[in-house]
Every structure is written in structure tokens, then in C-alpha cells.
Regions:
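Amphipathic, heptad-repeat alpha-helical segments used for oligomerization and assembly
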Residues: 206-219
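A helix-coil-helix interface module used to build multimeric assemblies
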Residues: 1-189, 193-201, 207
């Protein structure tokens, strides 16, 4: 994203550091799901995510100098920070896009929520001004020429109605993008589907049918 054209909140959602934090969130959720399914008995710290520090520059350095693969660099950096008894299960039987696309679902959901938050403020301003100018006259126009008189408040109320429809669309879009997958490299489940279901539920996502990646028609 080009910084000068990006709102700060949206820039934070799509920053490299935020991306890797979301990867940690997904990996931690999958680890807990595996434990809940009885795959191992080791204790998982309640604040596991806060124990794993990941900095984009360090991941990039490892990728450039050693792994030649962003996920391998991420896993090398993060697994080493886990208790030894948990390390074998971190990313176990998962493919890169189990982590990346599930994290993408978190980013997309946050983005829709941020857009809706901004739209809510804009709609409140439109409503205030529409009522304020309820009786403020202006000329109506058709085909860019003067027509019958209207009020400026009516014009603003029309814009408010359009924004309300956009608001409804954003609600639907949030549901559509809030998906994840842990179905492996070709969608045939190297992990029990119950682990995918548990992981997604803990993240507020819904499992989606996928191959290696989640189809981009969700956007």
C-alpha cells in the first residue's frame, strides 16, 4: 500500500507486522484445536500469542539470507520461542496457505469493520445536515438543467439512503470474507476437519471449501 494514500487504521491492518501477528494468531488457534482434539497433552500457556515476538524485518532477513521462503522464515523464528514440548506441533500437517489465507480472513474482516466504522460516522453527519437543511431551498436539476425546487435536506437524505444500502452490503461482505481453512495443500485434510472447525470457530471465522488457497471470489 502507498502510505500517503492510506488511512492510518487501514495501513496498520495491512502492515507486514500485522500480517505476521495474524499468522501467530492462526497458528496458536490451530495448536489449541489440536490439543482439544487430544493430539497431544502438553500444556499451552493462556497468553501464548504474547510469548511469540515476530518482527517483519527479521522474517525478511531470514527469508533473504537462509530460507528463501517467507513461511519457513516465520516458522523458524516463531517455533524457537515456544516451549520445547509444543514445537513439534506448531504448524504440524499444515500448508502455508492454511495459515496465510485464514489470517487473510482476519485482515479482510478488520478492513470491512474499519470501512463500516467510517461509513457510520459519515452517515451520522449526513443525517445531521439533512435535518439541519430540511427547509433550505435549492433548485432541482434533471439533465443538468434547472427543474422544480427541492431542499438541500432532501438531497442529503437521498445520499443517506444510498449509504444505508452500502452499510447493508458491508454486513454481507463481512460474513463473506470471514472464512478460514486448514484443509492442507490440496484441500484433502491432512488434519481432522474437526480441527479446522475448532480453529475457525475460535477466530470467529467459518470454514470454507478450498484447494490450496481460498478462492478470491469471496471479496
Amino acid at each position: 500500500m502507498i502510505k500517503r494514500y492510506t488511512r492510518p487504521a487501514m495501513g496498520e491492518i495491512w502492515s507486514e507486522d500485522a500480517k505476521f501477528r495474524n499468522w501467530v494468531t492462526v497458528e496458536a488457534a490451530a495448536l489449541r484445536a489440536k490439543a482439544a482434539a487430544g493430539e497431544f497433552a502438553a500444556t499451552i500457556p493462556d497468553q501464548l500469542e504474547s510469548l511469540v515476538a515476530v518482527v517483519a524485518e527479521e522474517v525478511d532477513r531470514l527469508e533473504r539470507e537462509k530460507t528463501r521462503h517467507d513461511m519457513k522464515a516465520f516458522l523458524e523464528l516463531t517455533a524457537s520461542q515456544l516451549p520445547a514440548e509444543l514445537q513439534p506441533y506448531w504448524h504440524d500437517r499444515m500448508t502455508s496457505y492454511d495459515t496465510e489465507d485464514t489470517a487473510l480472513g482476519l485482515q479482510l474482516r478488520s478492513s470491512v469493520q474499519e470501512i463500516r466504522k467510517t461509513l457510520t460516522g459519515f452517515m451520522a453527519a449526513l443525517k445531521t445536515r439533512a435535518l439541519e437543511h430540511k427547509y433550505t431551498p435549492q433548485i432541482g436539476r434533471t439533465h443538468l438543467v434547472h427543474a422544480e425546487p427541492i431542499t438541500f435536506g432532501v438531497k442529503l437524505a437521498n445520499w443517506y439512503a444510498e449509504c444505508f444500502r452500502h452499510f447493508v452490503r458491508l454486513d454481507y461482505l463481512e460474513q463473506r470474507v470471514s472464512v478460514g481453512k486448514l484443509s492442507g495443500a490440496v484441500g484433502m485434510f491432512t488434519l481432522d476437519p474437526e480441527i479446522e472447525a475448532r480453529t475457525c470457530e475460535s477466530l470467529g471465522l467459518k470454514p470454507v471449501i478450498a484447494t490450496q488457497i481460498v478462492s478470491r471470489d469471496i471479496i
